[in-house]
Amino acid sequence: VNEEVRRFLAEIEGDMGGLPRDLHITRMFSSLVAISNGRVIKVADPKLEYCPLASSLYDFPRGLDAESLRKEIIKAAERKISELGLFTGLRPLHRSTIAIPFGASEMMMYDLKSGRAEAAVVVCDGAGTVIAEDPHLVQGIGARMNGVFYTSPIEAVIRGIEEGGGEVLSPETARIDQVAGVERALGRHGRIDVTVSGFCGEGLREIRELESERGASVTILAVCTTGASEERVREIGEFADLVWSCASGKVRGVLGRRARLQIATKIPVYALTDRGLDFAASYSSKGFREYISEFEGPYIISGRCGAIPGARDCRRIRMGDFETYIARVESLPIRSGDEPRPLL
């Protein structure tokens, strides 16, 4: 956990005279949210004023003060608990449909289906680090899930993952340790995907060292980057294959400029490497590979190709289960007027 999460845990401990046995920390609308026994027990002050994704999913009103935003965050978290069972033993663990068009779990699901990757190392509330080969288990864990920065064991979740063919790194503690998860996965697989928190300090360099030692191929997806420090963003740029920009101005400004591919404009995903392009290609059943072999990049994927300044050679392609467009541009990033505010 990073210092901000550590302080949040200390506040919970002080408020309650100790940490609850059942405790999960996620983040919504830039605020850390603590959940215990199926209810929200603490919400940090929000730093964002607006997020297009949150507004779309939860109908957040605009122009709210901090206290009103906190109440909306609590309502949104409670909906996730009551409607989806997240942070409880009732959460679903298998899903085959797309929840977020360019979500990390959606793209990993297709990557596993294509055979490009053999397994994925992900994080699940109630289980911690999980190694999974089943595409639908990966999507079931990740669909509609924000970042998980701390969690505790939930027996029903761990049992469901194991019965579904997944492996929980530490069933006794639900420890989140993506480096150890990669090491475990590389004992059986040579090609894996792994999600790594951009906000916390999970060891990107250590993952690359393991990859080199084992002669493996590891696709690193840097997610949950809101609030990432400049040093962390540079580290992501050095070691990750793809990065989700979330509400990070540093990711857009530093890594967007060197991206090979930008996916979407409001909350862009940037492919930084050839391996990142291959990963994106596995999400496309039609048109993507042909396009990048025909034209030099950088590229942008957007549903509104005609509105992208300087876009050339627009072509319709299929990504996931929907149609969109790819084009080439002179430079990236392409910014949107409808992005999170303020960028952090």
PLM regions and their residue ranges:
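Conserved mixed alpha/beta catalytic, RNA-binding, or beta-rich assembly cores of soluble enzyme
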Residues: 2-344
